[in-house]
Design a protein with these regions (language model features):
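Conserved N-terminal segment of class I S-adenosyl-L-methionine
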Residues: 1-144, 153-157, 227, 240, ...
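A structural micro-motif
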Residues: 96, 117, 168, 220-221
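S-adenosyl-L-methionine-dependent methyltransferase catalytic module, highlighting the catalytic core
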Residues: 151-162, 169-294
Length: 295
């Protein structure tokens, strides 16, 4: 599929990238200002229903990761770009030894301050290189909504390949952007522009096929890809189109949370099969690839 947009170019592996790409210094300055001015997406609080939603999604993805590991025992968990620390908290409760890295401690201090001692702040690539140099290995690495933010997604996945232990798993979640569905929305006039292009926050844009391609090129075997609730289906209906009418955003989010919690009443394996089918046809606002190191 061809996407003609002057802001993006197609990488040889199929994903879309910002064009031109900011320099590392420009990006560092941007995020320094971003956190200093409290412009991040972190909320001051979440409802009990939202916390249950976070836990439900973590439980589903953890179930699939554990099925691939096949050990049934907790191990070492690394969350790269751990944000507010909800994954760290969930896995610690499940008995794992947890570590997190992030550009800032703002999120973890706001939502899970008791886990701040498990988190190191700084440049993600530098922190990963330090762990590689120390021959650290992890049984499960979590990379949620991070790959799209970095200048060098190929280099990031290559580094993580050196940190996952034999038999371990890397779970990579990215927005499902540049999809055939999004182009259909634009072509039919449901959206006025490619709303999903969010520069300089998002520098790379992935679909199921391009996520699989970059994984394969960086030493990983892709075992499974699942989607999540396809909230952008609301954009085909005038009464719920949250791009044209921002006032619809909160109700769309509530519907997503309620539907996800309803699904969470079913066995995680069944829910994951449902979301794998959605991903296979290009749907799901986010997609998660479960990767194992190639021998």
């Amino acid at each position: 599929m061809t996407i003609n947009d002057s802001r993006l170019k197609r990488h040889p592996l199929g994903f879309l990238q910002a064009d031109p790409m900011p320099t590392a210094q420009e990006l560092s300055d941007y995020y320094a200002s971003y956190y200093q001015q409290e412009r991040s997406n972190y909320r001051k609080s979440y409802t009990a229903q939202e916390h249950a939603f976070f836990d439900a999604k973590l439980a589903q993805r953890a179930a699939l990761a554990e099925k691939l590991r096949g050990t049934g025992t907790p191990g070492r968990f690394l969350d790269v770009g751990c944000g507010e620390g909800f994954a760290l908290a969930w896995f610690r409760r499940a008995g794992w030894h947890v570590e997190g890295i992030d550009h800032s401690l703002a999120g973890i201090k706001a939502m899970n301050p008791d886990l701040a001692d498990a988190v190191t702040a700084g440049d993600l690539f530098g922190l990963l290189d330090t762990r590689i140099g120390a021959s650290e290995k992890y049984d499960l690495v979590w990379l949620t909504n991070v790959l799209e933010h970095v200048i060098d997604p190929v280099g990031l996945l290559e580094r993580l390949r050196r940190l996952v232990a034999p038999g371990g798993v890397l779970a990579v979640t990215v927005p499902n952007d540049g999809s055939a569905y999004q182009e259909k929305l634009l072509a039919d006039g449901h959206i006025p522009e490619r709303f999903w292009i969010a520069l300089p926050d998002h520098l790379a844009y992935f679909t199921r096929d391009s996520l699989r391609a970059i994984a394969g090129a960086t030493g990983w075997d892709c075992q499974e890809i699942i989607g999540d609730f396809p909230i952008d289906l609301f954009l085909m209906h005038d009464g719920s189109n949250y791009v044209r009418d921002r006032m619809q955003g909160a109700s769309a989010h509530r519907a997503r949370v309620e539907m996800e919690l309803l699904l969470a009443e079913q066995p995680a394996e069944a829910v994951n099969r449902f979301y794998a089918a959605l991903a296979e046809v290009g749907l799901g606002r986010n997609i998660t690839a479960f990767l194992t190191p190639r021998d």
